[in-house]
Amino acid sequence: MKLLTNANTLKGTIRVPGDKSISHRAIIFGSISQGVTRIVDVLRGEDVLSTIEAFKQMGVLIEDDGEIITIYGKGFAGLTQPNNLLDMGNSGTSMRLIAGVLAGQEFEVTMVGDNSLSKRPMDRIALPLSKMGARISGVTNRDLPPLKLQGTKKLKPIFYHLPVASAQVKSALIFAALQTKGESLIVEKEQTRNHTEDMIRQFGGHLDIKDKEIRLNGGQSLVGQDIRVPGDISSAAFWIVAGLIIPNSHIILENVGINETRTGILDVVSKMGGKIKLSSVDNQVKSATLTVDYSHLQATHISGAMIPRLIDELPIIALLATQAQGTTVIADAQELKVKETDRIQVVVESLKQMGADITATADGMIIRGNTPLHAASLDCHGDHRIGMMIAIAALLVKEGEVDLSGEEAINTSYPNFLEHLEGLVNA
């Protein structure tokens, strides 16, 4: 498709879709709790739909009237063996988190995914879940999907130091630990998004958190809840960057999630000199309205504990850095290599094709700004965040056309992204 180019200004108000991470977890907790859970503002992207379909196949009644998703929870003990393979599509979150649930079930399941998911490492969950007593391995390759998983009702507690900073691995172990008899201890390498921990408490469970240590007991009773999902800051990030780099822009983003483990992009943007203001803060839901204005930006350095707080935003931050004065360094971000694509390689190649001065490193990128971008023909590579990054980059192109292939990947997390983009350009 031909993307919008040469934007003079962006103006408007957007309500971004519900947070993908929270939507997945709300569906899972609703299914493994007793009683009814009602969820408002769920993201209805392809990844979350994979999670919904998986629990339907395991006997959970889930209704969607277009506004509210209602889940009639069955508890861990009420899940039943699916008749077919569990197809997780492109969703690594679905596969890893649901593997933690399945570890405590006595039936055998095979989980499959698309070509992209079939290249993503699963040994990071297979190893600790095997230590707990589940049998899990790749069908054709030990470390990659499809995964065959045989759970057990005799799952053992675990004491485990996470070798990578991964909220998905942590969450898989938490779901497994809830099905043990005894106390588990999970120690993070760096603090990652804590939606699973927050939601356990919302559903009536208990855990103890001290620094990077999480302790929890198995056998807890979880009870259905009413949940409102805030907007996804990872989706809002594209509009934040667009507003900062297109002259005279003024964008208002309503109901954006501001969980402290996810707001790294706000800290980085402020450090770079970006004009971004928070208002209408809701401390219960952890959401706020963000107002973004065009800004003159300075380069920065992003590494260490900051990386897990903005790992999904790094592609669009790389674009932001092409428009900042000076050299931006992104380091300690090797996790980007095992996302939907090798995001280090694909971001660097895509932006280079558009004229950016950007270099890949073993664990990140070096970006020298500021540089004008030019027309090119590009591909999403099956990665929603790459597609949206390119669409924002195209707005800076003054002459010629930007062609994007595989734009359907954007539906993974933001089905009406291109419609919202058109609204901002034509306001």
Curated annotation (Swiss-Prot):
Pathway: Metabolic intermediate biosynthesis; chorismate biosynthesis; chorismate from D-erythrose 4-phosphate and phosphoenolpyruvate: step 6/7. It is an enzyme of class 2 (transferase). Disulfide bonds: none annotated. CDD domains: EPSP_synthase. GO terms for biological process: amino acid biosynthetic process; aromatic amino acid family biosynthetic process; chorismate biosynthetic process. Its main location: cytoplasm. Monomer. Phosphoenolpyruvate binds at residues 20, 92, 120, 168, 343, 385. Keywords: Amino-acid biosynthesis, Aromatic amino acid biosynthesis, Cytoplasm, Transferase. It holds the Pfam family EPSP_synthase. Belongs to the EPSP synthase family. This is 3-phosphoshikimate 1-carboxyvinyltransferase. 3-phosphoshikimate binds at residues 20-21, 25, 166, 168, 312, 339. PROSITE patterns: EPSP_SYNTHASE_1, EPSP_SYNTHASE_2. It is found in: Cytoplasm. InterPro entries: Enolpyruvate_Tfrase_dom, Enolpyruvate_Tfrase_sf, EPSP_synthase, EPSP_synthase_CS, RNA3'P_cycl/enolpyr_Trfase_a/b. Transmembrane segments: none annotated. Its EC number is 2.5.1.19. GO terms for molecular function: 3-phosphoshikimate 1-carboxyvinyltransferase activity. Catalyzes the transfer of the enolpyruvyl moiety of phosphoenolpyruvate (PEP) to the 5-hydroxyl of shikimate-3-phosphate (S3P) to produce enolpyruvyl shikimate-3-phosphate and inorganic phosphate. The active site is at residue 312. The keyword Cytoplasm applies. Gene3D superfamilies: Enolpyruvate transferase domain. It catalyses: 3-phosphoshikimate + phosphoenolpyruvate = 5-O-(1-carboxyvinyl)-3-phosphoshikimate + phosphate. Signal peptide: none annotated. The keyword Cytoplasm applies.
